[in-house]
Amino acid sequence: LGHVVLEGSALDVVTFEVEPDRSMEDAPVGVDRVLDYGARERREVKMDLFAREYLLPRPVLREFHVNEGLTSAMIATRFGAPLAVVQQQLLDALLLPADEQHPVGSGGVAAALTPDPTQMEAAAHRGLAFQLQAGPGTGKTRTLVRRIEGLLADGVDPATILVLTFSNKAANELSERIAASNPLAAAAMWIGTFHAFGLDIVHRFHDQLALPAAPRLIDRTEAIELLEEEFPRLDLKHYRNLWDPALDLSDMLSSISRAKDEVIDAAGYRVLAQSMAARAGTDQDARVRAQKCLEVAMLFEAYERLLTTHQLLDFGDLVALPVRLVEGSAEVRDALRARHEHVLVDEYQDVNRASVRLLKAIVGDGRNLWVVGDARQSIYRFRGASATNIARFAVDFPGAQSAELGINYRSDERIVDVFTEFARGMQASTSTLPLTLKADRGTRGEQVELRVAESPDDEISALAASITALHEQGIAYGGQAVLCASNARLNAIAVGLEARGIPALHLGSLFERPEIKDLLALLSLATDPRAAAMVRVATMARHQMPLQDVMRVIEHLRAANPASLAWSAIHAEVDGLADGSREALARLSPLFAGVNASTNPWTLLAGWTIDGLEIAKTLYRTGDAQSRMKGLAIWQFLNFCRRQPRGQGVPVLRLLDRIRRLALLSEDRGLSQLPRSAENIDAVRLMTIHGSKGLEFEVVHLPGMVTSGLPRNNVPPRCPPPDGLIHGSEGLTGIEAVKAGHDEEEECLFFVALSRARNRLQLYAYARQADGRARSPSRFVAPIERLLAHPAHVPLRAGPTLTGVPLSITWQGRPQWTDIQVNLFERCPRRFLYTHVLK
């Protein structure tokens, strides 16, 4: 039925794989960050979601649960549906925005226009390799889609068309664009990321790689877990944190991953490291760098052995392994060339050498290869991307032709003038076609401004004043975006805007959000016999207890040394508890009824969110901007918890351990990415410049235009690559190559930020740091200074003073602290509380 309604298909469609409780989208972290559905699977996902909505309409479920008070179990019984399906649909109905209209802030202006002659000419190219250099807002995606439509009109079999992108989101959007006019063709062609395509090759030719048909893919946290037992045996000197090897292992795995981006294996890594050692001579610094690289080579060799033994793959293998296979096997090459006659690549500036080598192996002389990109928007150096691949296109594919799109459909002419002026001095511009864009919209908006406040706090006040003024002029909050280079500054801005009553769409660090910490604290009570998380649980409205009573509970458990969950039955046993505290403990117990060592954490959390704590219902009823953000955060958290790596042990403990490790290694950043349905909320978009790539907004605010704000200082990696590893870095040491890439990437980041706005672009800086010292403006301002307006008066919107409430503690006797304990208090008062006060 879904195929008929959504596609108008009269064909009989039969599927044998139905997943009615699937999430609307995968969690953007771990393995799910890379894996994606193929076109056919993507189509079936849509049908599964259609079927669930058809059978369990969200408005009906909201009525039953919110207004009639039915629990998820009651609703499941009434419909005769599986409980997990009902719970997932209720989570979607209560925590995600109900409005499914187009997002306020993003979307493409150029996509709605008739193709211009340069777009039509580029789309019509046939024959040898072709590179289209497409600046911001020039309609590159429309041109790519038009080329695909042209190939289909020429009679090309859609099954022979391969389209490679650099994100699952881009692949999904491209597939949807094509499916809008030709759903069957969209399902037949292969559209996805380089990593997903590499995995497809591994699956097809697994026997030639000595792998099972479906080898398991592991993420960074699983790789560390795999290596932890091997790590102490390696006799390392420079990377030897045996107390907590995760940090060293993560840094070393980053270096190994970077090597795989260059298709360098462990043996090749060792050769480069040995060459460094041979050249070092008496230079002590050079000798140390070589020794560090040799230690990484040692770990690399052990890692490869473990991956082979356990028949596992990591992300870097998904392109590096297929490259070696295709380059070394004429049979595989011929099979892939026959299967993929037409190859199209989006965002070509983001390819690394492994991706280029894979393309060269598949397309041969480059016939029917068509790529589009912009060297000035190359912002993914950490995964090996380089703007030089745009410059080297004719070298990699001899006889290749290049053209450019020359009309910007997105931005006001004054904004176009600013980013084209900056482009003239960019390193990425040295070997590409000049950026000469005509602004199709002409001059309609205001001159680009640089607003200089006195301090970092005043910068937020200036930002708030500007957003408020524009909103009063009729510009929706959702049409305005704040872009920053770092998440830390975004977090401070989000707090500042919300304190001033300005709705902000920003998740930040998911595991640091209060509502997620509450759920994690409750979850830990399921496995911790001493209930240490009771300190936080006792601050929740339904379970409030004074700290003295919490201490009595913890001391009672410490003395009794009970089994897990024994705390849930002691509310009548603990001496000295206030009546309210006994009642709070008693209210906690039902949440853990039936919980055991095999309980699925998602089942537990979903039950609490919907029924046990009625969080979802409360947030839905409140409905303000803050409640919507809390709901989105909880939905994202539960979506993350749905699918976890396989392993031994108690599922709840494994989940908690993985969360700790993800947070420690900053591998949780993908979880700050909002669900697609959140794009409809009318709130100011706060995002990193990386996250804004491919988006556009009516107004863009760009704070932090100060020294070290943008460009940021280069921080050398703890495990720098060996000399000669990075392609195109001849004559540079590994550290110098990383720095050169960093400097170029910072320019590209600023260029991307400047080119996101349609009508208004406002830059912000501050004259003094928080400690009163003067702060110079960013060096990126100078090249565009003549095009900027500098308001003499910068309006500020002051916010309330945010102060914490001190925790009052009564000591039995005078406490004594060591210098180590005092230092811990200065670094982290909360850790001091848990470690030395609540001991």
Region locations from a protein language model:
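Histidine-centered divalent metal-coordination motifs
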Residues: 1-3, 195, 349, 690
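Conserved motor-region signature of P-loop NTPase helicases/translocases
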Residues: 104-175, 338, 344-345, 349-538, ...
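Conserved helicase C-terminal RecA-like lobe
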Residues: 269-272, 285-289, 429, 476, ...
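C-terminal, charged and often intrinsically disordered regions of DNA end-processing helicases
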Residues: 128, 133, 500, 575, ...
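A basic/glycine-biased coupling hinge at the interface between accessory DNA-binding modules
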Residues: 151-320, 330-333, 338, 367, ...
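Active-site-flanking alpha-helical
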Residues: 2, 6-10, 144, 202, ...
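Active-site hotspot residues in diverse enzymes, especially metal/ion-binding acidic/histidine motifs
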Residues: 1-107
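Short, polar/flexible loop-turn hinges at active-site or ligand-entry regions and domain interfaces
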Residues: 156-160, 181-188, 205-219, 231-245, ...
